């Protein structure tokens, strides 16, 4: 049971003040493969470019908005999926992906405009944040 679940059971919840900062020096803690994926995503975010990758046997094109870490310590990306379909049949929309499960992550070299998306930066769906647009 996570800390948040335990607090909920006990009736105690901390007031959410937003995500904590993760430090880029910590990227290597995820291992060589995941660190390389994180760096590719961060590079694309520097220029507001889409990324493409394979996830659950499906190709996805995503506008990355947040790269961070879950409360369980998993590297995550939150982004808007503009192309591709999930196993559940969902098409375009906001998604959270575990970076270690992403395959063949590359920069799509196509730009996107952050203002075209309804992004709530107060609640990025990560515990710690490496980068957020």
Ranges and model annotations:
Residues 1-133:
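Short glycine- and basic-residue-enriched patches
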């Amino acid at each position: 049971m996570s800390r948040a679940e335990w607090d909920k059971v006990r009736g105690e919840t901390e007031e959410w003040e937003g995500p904590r900062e993760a430090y880029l020096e910590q990227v290597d803690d995820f291992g060589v493969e995941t660190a390389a994926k994180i760096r590719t995503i961060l590079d694309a975010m520097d220029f507001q470019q889409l990324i493409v990758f394979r996830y659950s046997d499906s190709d996805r094109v995503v506008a990355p908005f947040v790269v961070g870490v879950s409360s369980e310590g998993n590297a995550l990306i939150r982004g808007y999926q503009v192309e591709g379909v999930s196993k559940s049949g969902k098409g375009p929309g906001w998604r959270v992906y575990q970076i270690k499960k992403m395959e063949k992550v590359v920069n799509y070299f196509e730009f996107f405009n952050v203002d075209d998306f309804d992004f709530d930066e107060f609640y990025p769906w990560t515990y710690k944040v490496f980068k957020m647009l």
